[in-house]
Design a protein with these regions (language model features):
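Generic anion/oxyanion-binding catalytic loop in active/binding sites
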Residues: 1, 45, 59
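N-terminal, positively charged/glycine-rich alpha-helical extensions of SAM-dependent methyltransferases
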Residues: 1-31
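Catalytic cores of glycan-processing enzymes that make or break glycosidic bonds
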Residues: 11-14, 43, 78
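Class I SAM-dependent methyltransferase SAM/SAH-binding core
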Residues: 51-103
Length: 103
């Protein structure tokens, strides 16, 4: 792997856990409130076509909050990211949400 690719991945890997714990990303709200949408998706919503029933691929999904928000609006979403640590945080949030909904 090229050195710049390794450094870039390490940079995003290092950001994943702090971002997941940050109130700016509000991961805990996604688990607690099934209607919560990310700030990014709420901002984009007036500019987006109807997403219900559509399939979407979210590139650079990071910790998944925008991807989950689009899914909450009815899209079938797949999130991809360069950072394994970011994807692990996204999976963790979804697993916590599923556990809460199953309880």
């Amino acid at each position: 792997m090229d050195e710049w690719v390794r450094l870039n991945r390490a940079n995003w890997d290092e950001r994943a856990a702090p971002h997941a714990a940050s109130p700016d990303y509000a991961v805990e709200r996604f688990v607690a409130d099934p209607d919560h949408l990310s700030d990014v998706v709420r901002f984009d919503l007036p500019r987006l076509p109807e997403v219900r029933g559509r399939r979407g691929l979210h590139l650079q999904c990071h910790i998944g909050t925008d991807t989950l928000s689009l899914a909450r609006l009815g899209a079938t979403m797949t999130g991809l990211d360069f950072s394994p640590a970011a994807l692990a945080e996204a999976r963790s949030a979804v697993e916590a949400l599923v556990t809460r909904l199953s309880a």
